[in-house]
């Protein structure tokens, strides 16, 4: 294998945000992504390295976590910015249009996907338009993804088996902790999804389960597993596209037990317009003074500058996240 056999891709994202809140400081964050794929006769290697700057402890992303899904993507055990290998996996090309990916994976990339609301670097910046708030995804973790491509008689199927805790979920944020699979506090994340993909429309439904125990609200020792269902509808025609998301989770242990989101995108001569609104509902057993349902909304306009590889994206958001 030579350097010519490796396909490289990457990008840099810088975000400046100011909030209409005297208690919150303006914040500048930055991140970088580098992908390397190596094609082999039986499959493909994928490596993903990402880095992010240190967040401002009094900045916008600290007080309003959903408004910048690109912030805090890589943190050290002390809470500072860092660099890490987030994906390192191999995809086997199996017979009958099937693939099997194993290694260090991103579970959220395989469930609850949308054509216009899934990537904070080139689409909506607000995290509520990247993934469903009710799905308790692990961070980058060890696991496997079996994908069965669809055809005219069946939908595309995705099956996931992964660790319940990823790098950012662990106290030391280390690969050594990630490999410690004997911890009593850990379990597995199971996910299944079905997708019907057409030229103009797409339908996705799925279910997920975490086997690690969560303490039921109001109890000190009674536990249950968190689980849920999700659905995504997509539509596109000409310059217009629409994305609708919903989800439910176990209200006994999940703070966010219901979610609904709507996103719209329109291509114009000058750039890409996006408008979205999402509502995250708090479970009744977790509701208390100062904690209530959350609202996220965003309008952005992505403008290419000096070609198609550079963009400037003004974004206005209105959020309410009491107690989240």
Feature locations, PLM:
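Residues that define the transmembrane beta-barrel architecture of outer-membrane proteins
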Residues: 16-18, 24-32, 81-86, 138-142, ...
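Outer membrane beta-barrel
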Residues: 29-164, 254-261, 267, 272-285
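Predominantly the C-terminal beta-signal and adjacent terminal strand-loop region
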Residues: 47, 275, 288-291, 295-324
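Detector for outer-membrane/organellar transmembrane beta-barrel domains
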Residues: 42, 151-157, 195-285, 295
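Membrane-embedded hairpin module used as a gating/binding unit in multi-pass transport
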Residues: 146, 158-215
């Amino acid at each position: 294998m030579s350097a010519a056999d490796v396909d490289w891709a990457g990008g840099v994202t810088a975000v400046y945000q100011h909030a209409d809140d005297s208690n919150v400081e303006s914040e500048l964050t930055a991140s970088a992504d580098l992908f390397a794929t190596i094609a082999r006769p039986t499959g493909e290697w994928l490596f993903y390295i990402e880095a992010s700057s240190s967040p401002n402890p009094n900045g916008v992303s600290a007080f309003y976590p959903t408004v910048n899904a690109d912030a805090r993507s890589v943190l050290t055990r002390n809470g500072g910015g860092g660099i890490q290998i987030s994906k390192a996996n191999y995809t086997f090309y199996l017979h009958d249009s099937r693939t099997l990916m194993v290694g260090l994976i991103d579970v959220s990339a395989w469930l609850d996907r949308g054509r216009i609301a899934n990537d904070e670097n080139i689409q909506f910046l607000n995290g509520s338009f990247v993934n469903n708030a009710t799905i308790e995804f692990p961070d980058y973790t060890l696991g496997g993804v079996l994908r069965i491509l669809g055809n005219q008689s069946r939908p595309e199927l995705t099956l996931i088996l992964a660790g319940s805790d990823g790098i950012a979920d662990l106290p030391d944020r280390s690969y050594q902790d990630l490999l410690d699979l004997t911890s009593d506090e850990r379990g597995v994340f199971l996910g299944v999804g079905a997708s019907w993909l057409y030229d103009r429309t797409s339908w996705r439904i799925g279910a997920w389960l975490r086997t690690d125990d969560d303490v039921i609200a109001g109890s000190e020792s009674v536990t249950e597993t968190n689980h849920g269902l999700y659905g995504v509808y997509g539509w596109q025609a000409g310059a217009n596209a629409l994305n609708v998301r919903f989800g439910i989770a176990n209200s006994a242990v999940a703070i966010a037990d219901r979610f609904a989101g709507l996103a719209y995108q329109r291509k114009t001569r000058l750039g890409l317009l996006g408008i979205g609104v999402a509502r995250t509902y708090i479970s009744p057993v977790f509701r208390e003074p100062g904690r209530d349902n959350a609202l996220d909304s965003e309008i952005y306009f992505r403008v290419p500058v000096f070609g198609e590889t550079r963009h400037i994206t003004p974004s206005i958001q209105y959020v309410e996240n009491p107690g989240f």
